[in-house]
Amino acid sequence: MQNFGKVAVLMGGFSSEREISLDSGTAILNALKSKGIDAYAFDPKETPLSELKERGFQTAFNILHGTYGEDGAVQGALELLGIPYTGSGVAASAIGMDKYRCKLIWQALGLPVPEFAVLYDDTDFDAVEEKLGLPMFVKPAAEGSSVGVVKVKEKGRLKSVYEELKHLQGEIIAERFIGGGEYSCPVLNGKGLPGIHIIPATEFYDYEAKYNRDDTIYQCPSEDLTEAEESLMRELAVRGAQAIGAEGCVRVDFLKDTDGKLYLLEINTLPGMTGHSLVPKSAAVTGVGFADLCIEILKAAHVG
């Protein structure tokens, strides 16, 4: 096996997704140790990143979700320290965390995305409601794990929802509702993995459904995707990742409308690795267990 040296599993951090990061990090740490890797937990909230060098770490497995962890900040710090790290680089991480600018890139390349509008204080909210229709989804551009996602159903409520959310990270986006189904497709080192059909017990796949409930249904392989649709989803996921320069292990979320058309919703350049997480479920279908998945991700650690 490749010699990774002393490995820091970066977990925890400062974002609203800290607890999820700690859960993912603990699972990864145990998996790496089971494979004989000299791995240790490292929480930047407790210990400055500069101590990575001082403590002799040679590789970083980054599982810091959210702000500072997957937005290019920690990636830039690791570049300066010269420590190889897993996942996407600075630019791809920043773009992937910014749903608005990621959508602009996908649109420019002809990839299908749901119609959307960016909201500001002086937006004509009635016009946006008329354009996108109801219901619609409203979300902050730079939060993860569905933090701050609201489904707006009543006419005239868009402005009040915007006021509730505008303190969150990034622009606030209103997005056309696509009925039909929610899916996710991982990409591992440039290769699309089996798509997952997500059937939440809640109204949509929110934070509660992702992390706190055991009645969300995950179908992998998906029972309602044709072979052609599955192939197209993998192709679009790979193209979506390549469009922003994403590397390593990423996950692209999709919506499918009632006519069967697929839409790219967003990309997660640092997907979760908890018991509820989607990437391990998809990898398992291909015969790759959790520990081996962690090793494959670690193999792609890089600087620059």
UniProtKB/Swiss-Prot annotation:
Binding site for Mg(2+) 2: 266, 268
Cofactor(s) essential for the protein: Mg(2+); Mn(2+)
Any Pfam family hit: Dala_Dala_lig_C
EC numbers: 6.3.2.4
GO (cellular component) term, any one: cytoplasm
Main location: cytoplasm
SUPFAM superfamilies, alphabetized: Glutathione synthetase ATP-binding domain-like (SSF56059), PreATP-grasp domain (SSF52440)
UniProt-listed InterPro entries: ATP-grasp, ATP_grasp_subdomain_1, D-Ala_lig_Van_CS, D_ala_D_ala, Dala_Dala_lig_C, Dala_Dala_lig_N, PreATP-grasp_dom_sf
Domain of life: Bacteria
Gene Ontology molecular function, alphabetical: ATP binding; D-alanine-D-alanine ligase activity; metal ion binding
Residues annotated as binding Mg(2+) 1: 253, 266
Record keyword Kinase present: no
Protein name per Swiss-Prot or TrEMBL: D-alanine--D-alanine ligase
Organism: Neisseria gonorrhoeae (strain ATCC 700825 / FA 1090)
